[in-house]
């Protein structure tokens, strides 16, 4: 399993992928808005603390998501670290 950031048109998505790259699950994301960056970490319930708006920089928004470790909610996600390389979106 691997966790990595993937570029999108208005931000980045945090992806949990299996080793064969057959299963790709979005576990978080950051998008640019007029007021800064909005960030969220996926959850299986209602947890408003897993989303934040108006973060000043992309790096701070990504750090917010990574600190919540949303990939650990999924089987096989324990103990993983985020790959520092941002990947482009598949075409």
Language model features with spans:
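Short N-terminal "domain-start" leader segments
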Residues: 1-40, 82, 86-90
């Amino acid at each position: 399993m691997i966790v990595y950031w993937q570029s999108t048109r208005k931000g980045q998505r945090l992806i949990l992928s299996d080793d064969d790259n057959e299963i790709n699950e979005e576990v978080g994301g950051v998008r640019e808005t007029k007021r800064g960056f909005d960030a969220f970490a996926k959850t299986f319930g209602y947890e408003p603390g897993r989303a934040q708006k108006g973060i000043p920089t992309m790096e701070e928004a990504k750090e917010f998501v990574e600190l919540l470790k949303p990939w650990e909610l999924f089987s096989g996600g324990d103990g993983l670290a985020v790959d520092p390389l941002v990947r482009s979106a598949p075409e």
